[in-house]
From Swiss-Prot:
Compositional bias (Polar residues): 469-508, 527-537
Keywords: Cytoplasm, Metal-binding, Transferase, Ubl conjugation pathway, Zinc, Zinc-finger
Organism: Xenopus laevis
Name of the protein: E3 ubiquitin ligase Rnf157
Catalytic activity: S-ubiquitinyl-[E2 ubiquitin-conjugating enzyme]-L-cysteine + [acceptor protein]-L-lysine = [E2 ubiquitin-conjugating enzyme]-L-cysteine + N(6)-ubiquitinyl-[acceptor protein]-L-lysine
Organism lineage string: Eukaryota, Metazoa, Chordata, Craniata, Vertebrata
GO biological process: protein ubiquitination
Biased composition (Low complexity): 509-526
Acidic residues bias: start-end ranges: 583-604
Entries under SMART domains matching the protein: RING (SM00184)
Sequence segments annotated as region (Disordered): 376-404, 433-610
Compartment annotation: Cytoplasm
Described function: E3 ubiquitin ligase that ubiquitinates apbb1 for its degradation by the proteasome and thus prevents apoptosis and promotes survival of neurons. Has a dual role in neurons as it is also required for dendrite growth and maintenance for which its ligase activity is not critical. May act as a scaffold molecule to regulate this process. Acts as a downstream effector of the interconnected PI3K and MAPK signaling pathways and thus participates in the regulation of the cell cycle.
């Protein structure tokens, strides 16, 4: 995307052109964009010439003025590809100037004002050893795809500080100070004509040949207050991977404020940042509006909005495209290894019936916000239930809360009059695109197991009449998600930080859905969150079937037709047991229907269980994908490449967009132009 003549017969490195001519916006001549663009493996015609889909056109000038060779070959539509790894992320909202405690007075002048110096502090995450250097009044140069920054003078840069891998690391260099008052007023801000950045934080990966040149760049400006003090303002962030520079853009509405440490967050602010679509207030939001980048719609409402309106419901600005982002998680088999390679799915169709056909084998669709932030609205009232079983996975198992796409109807209900917890005869089944669905053969096997257990129930009834409560009658059912300790890499989605070997690294939330049968069987599906990209818009929805019976999972591989879990009182509290007295059973040992309310009599939504998610409750917000325990909420970013698509049959220069996600994350992107 650029001048056609400059790309036909000349190599990228041999082009003779001014440094600030063709690849600046607006260009001095010709067009910056071509007539089409490629997203998610599908070609789209540009409906708005010279229109940047992901932000302001002026943002393109941060990508650099010279092209480089794009290092990736264009994959076939059916060929899986790896997502980009984002090993470093600087949380730009944490960047600040801290006034030094010791102020230097000007020598020889009495009564002069003390000279104020500042330290620079910020928080960052890294999945590898990293070297961080700060530059002031610096220009940017690319040599072999690796950026370098040259300050105006040698004293306008800090010493290089080395850090090991880790999450939520604090950069604080007391011996390095900066005094913005020494600079002219025009040097405090960024001027495109001068191409001088007031402040640059350059973090470079120092390990692994495969990560050579991998770096993260934070550019910032200074602002002077009325009292003479200064503050620093983040300008832009870039990620350099394999010699390609990607511009990071925020996605608004993807952060999780329920895990915020700030107790002063207003309730209405929390409600504004809930997971529900702002139009229907029921389905989970998964569609991004471009170019304003508000993630506020579900795919069904977005499909309707295309034909009824042309303005964003949040900012009321006209939009030109809708981008659906579907997160998927991998459901490994019983003998599958812990690590895996993420893939990007092929383009999907517009029909929801065909949505499941484009889900890669072994993956299932989950809520994007749940995948990034963990459970959004855990209920504080219901204690977590533990299922009976022989094997237990280490670590906590947070539930998905009461989200409409992810909730599982609880079969337990408290009854008045001092009666114990009783088991319902009819259990409603909720089927959605984010819930685990049992196959028909599993249903038949579960029903056959229930028939086998009928003589056992009669025996238990006789034993209960004699004052003995059989252990097999102590039943618990639970629906929970778990966070896998393994972590991987890559915003979009965003600049995310994680590592398959480091349990402390941040990653997209990896979850487990488990259901315990009425015979105390625990079936857990360990899953890893992945993400895929696809180039067509996919309308999604949710179907619910009330009054159905949720079958129990098939018996474990031990070979016994039923597993009778046994828990000691110290291991499981009494509220987790369900006792059915003999008087409440009929002659065949079944629970009588009069004692229990039908699903149609339930008013309101079932309350989700309280659980700990992978984000520590009580942490400040930040704008990265950090979902390791003890980490904070996150804000995903979208990456855009500065490299023209030479191998995409497009002769013009522009930014190749890319989604920077974790290695175990697949984000399904569907785009539909308006």
């Amino acid at each position: 995307m650029g001048a056609l003549a400059s790309r036909q017969h000349a190599g990228v490195e041999e082009m003779d052109m001014p440094c600030n001519s063709l690849y600046r916006y607006p260009p001095k001549s010709g067009s910056y964009f071509g007539s089409h663009f490629i997203m998610g493996g599908e070609k789209f015609e540009s409906s708005h010439p010279e229109g940047y889909l992901f932000g302001e056109n002026s943002d393109l000038n941060f990508l650099g003025s010279r092209p480089v060779t794009f290092p990736y070959t264009a994959p076939s539509p059916q060929e899986p590809v790896k997502t980009l790894r984002s090993l470093i992320n600087i949380r730009k909202d944490t960047l600040r100037l801290v006034r030094c405690t010791e102020e230097l007075k000007t020598t020889g002048v009495e009564g002069s004002r003390p000279k104020v110096h500042y330290n620079v502090e910020f928080t960052f995450d890294t999945d590898a050893r990293v070297a961080i250097t700060m530059y002031y009044q610096a220009t940017e140069e690319f040599q072999g795809g690796i950026p370098s920054y040259l300050p105006k003078s040698s004293n306008l840069q800090s010493d290089t500080v080395h850090f090991k891998r880790g999450v939520s690391q604090q950069f604080c260099f007391p011996s390095h100070t900066v005094d913005p008052s020494e600079w002219r007023e025009e040097e405090l801000t960024f001027d495109l004509d001068r191409e001088v950045y007031p402040m640059v934080v350059h973090a470079v990966v120092e390990e692994g040949e495969e990560h050579l040149g991998h770096s993260h760049v934070l550019m910032a400006t200074f602002e002077k207050h009325a009292d003479g003090s200064f503050c620093v303002k983040p300008l832009k962030q870039k990620q350099v991977v394999d010699g390609v520079s990607y511009l990071l853009q925020e996605i608004y509405g993807i952060e999780n404020k329920y895990n915020s440490q700030d107790s002063k967050v207003a309730e209405d602010e929390l409600s504004d940042n809930s997971a529900e679509c702002v139009v229907c207030l029921s389905d989970v939001r998964d569609t991004l509006i471009l170019p304003c980048r508000h993630l506020c719609l579900c795919n069904a409402c977005a499909d309707t909005l295309r034909y009824q309106a042309s303005n964003c419901p949040i900012c009321r600005l006209p939009f030109r495209a809708l981008l659906q982002i579907r997160a998927m998680r991998k459901v490994p088999g019983p003998h599958s290894p812990g690590g895996f390679s993420p893939i990007i799915a092929a383009p999907t169709s517009d029909s929801e019936e065909h949505t499941s056909e484009h889900v890669p084998p072994g993956y299932e669709v989950v809520s994007l916000l749940e995948a990034l932030n963990g459970p959004l609205t855990p209920s504080p009232s219901a204690p977590p239930l533990r299922a009976l079983g022989e094997a237990r996975r280490p670590g906590g198992l947070p539930s998905y809360g009461s989200d409409i796409h992810l909730r599982m109807h609880s079969p337990l209900q408290h009854l008045c009059g001092g009666q114990a917890l009783k088991l319902k005869k009819s259990i409603s089944r909720s089927i959605s695109q984010n819930s685990s669905v049992l196959q028909e053969d599993e249903m038949e096997k579960s029903f056959s197991e229930a028939e086998i257990q009928t003589p056992r129930k009669k025996t238990s009834q006789l034993a209960e009449e004699n004052g003995v409560t059989p252990e097999s009658e102590n039943l618990t059912l639970s629906s929970s998600g778990a966070i896998d300790q393994s972590s991987c890499t890559g915003t979009p989605l965003s600049p995310t930080i994680s590592s398959p070997e480091d349990p402390l690294s941040s990653s997209l939330a990896q979850s487990i859905m488990s259901m315990a049968s009425s015979h105390s069987q625990q079936s857990q599906l360990s899953t890893d969150t992945v993400s895929s990209m696809s180039g067509s818009y996919t309308a999604g929805g949710m179907e619910e079937e009330e009054g159905g019976i949720t079958p129990s999972p098939p018996a474990a591989a031990s070979g016994s037709p039923s597993i009778e879990g046994e828990l000691s009182p110290a291991e499981s509290p009494e509220p987790h047991f369900v006792t059915v007295s003999a008087e409440e059973m009929d002659a065949e040992g079944n629970v009588t229907e009069e004692e229990f309310a039908s699903p149609e009599e339930d008013d309101g939504q079932m309350t989700g269980r309280e659980c700990d998610n992978n984000n520590a409750a009580g942490v400040t917000l930040r704008d990265v994908l950090d979902n390791v325990r003890g980490s904070e909420g996150c804000l995903a970013d979208v990456c855009y490449s500065s490299i023209p698509g030479q191998q995409r049959s497009n002769p013009y220069h522009g930014s190749d967009n890319c989604i920077s996600l974790q290695d175990d994350t697949q984000s399904h992107l569907s785009t539909k132009l308006v």
